[in-house]
A protein has these predicted regions:
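Basic, amphipathic N-terminal segments that precede the first structured/catalytic domain
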Residues: 1-67
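Short secondary-structure capping micro-motifs at structural edges
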Residues: 54-63, 67-74, 96-103, 116-121
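Conserved catalytic cores of phosphodiester-cleaving nucleases, focusing on short active-site segments
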Residues: 72-74, 79-92
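Catalytic cores of nucleic-acid endonucleases
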Residues: 93-142, 150
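Short, low-complexity, polybasic intrinsically disordered segments
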Residues: 131-175
Length: 175
């Protein structure tokens, strides 16, 4: 039986110009280091480049319930907007760290669709990257790969990509 050939994901580096345009149109710009450490990242030397804090944008624009949204977005050199969800706390609280709680596929789908709906009224001048990046801590990355492989199963083009903070920074901010 022939296996389906999965397309490779091509990720473009961070674009200061596009991100500045997005930050101007959406407001809620925040230094990457502040956002990642606020989400639970434990990496040193995180750049100060600006990203858009989508959770803050969602809180500011929703009248009722806060829509489910990704944590951040930024512009890339291929004129696409990269959506990123931080999942550093899948290990739970201190006592429960041994049992990992994966994000559900439905939860991730809702975050992407709610984010796109939140941004749909804005003329952003760029499309969305086809992949949602999921950032995990180093100690959870192997399990995260298994989850993401399950989420992408049967898809010709992957919809999710797992990364550690170091991989993320090397791919987008130190290419």
């Amino acid at each position: 039986m022939a296996q389906k050939k999965r397309l490779q994901i091509s990720l473009a580096p961070y674009s200061t110009e596009l991100t500045k345009v997005l930050a101007h149109k959406l407001s809620h710009a925040k230094p990457l280091s502040d956002l990642l450490t606020g989400e639970g990242a434990k990496t040193n030397a995180i750049p100060q480049d600006l990203v858009v804090d989508v959770d803050a944008l969602a809180r500011a624009t929703s009248l009722g319930d806060k829509p489910s949204s990704v944590d951040m977005l930024f512009g890339c050199t291929n004129n696409l907007i990269q959506l990123v969800e931080c999942k550093y706390r899948v290990g739970g609280k201190k006592r429960d760290r041994k049992s990992l709680t994966p994000p559900t596929k439905r939860e991730l789908e809702n975050k992407v669709s709610d984010t796109k709906q939140l941004l749909s009224r804005k003329d952003l001048g760029a499309g969305f990257a086809p992949v949602l990046l999921l950032l995990f801590s180093d100690r959870h990355i192997e399990q995260a790969r298994a989850w993401v492989n399950d989420y992408n199963a049967g898809k010709k083009t992957p919809l999710y990509k797992e990364m550690t903070t170091t991989d993320f920074l090397d791919t987008f901010f130190h290419p």
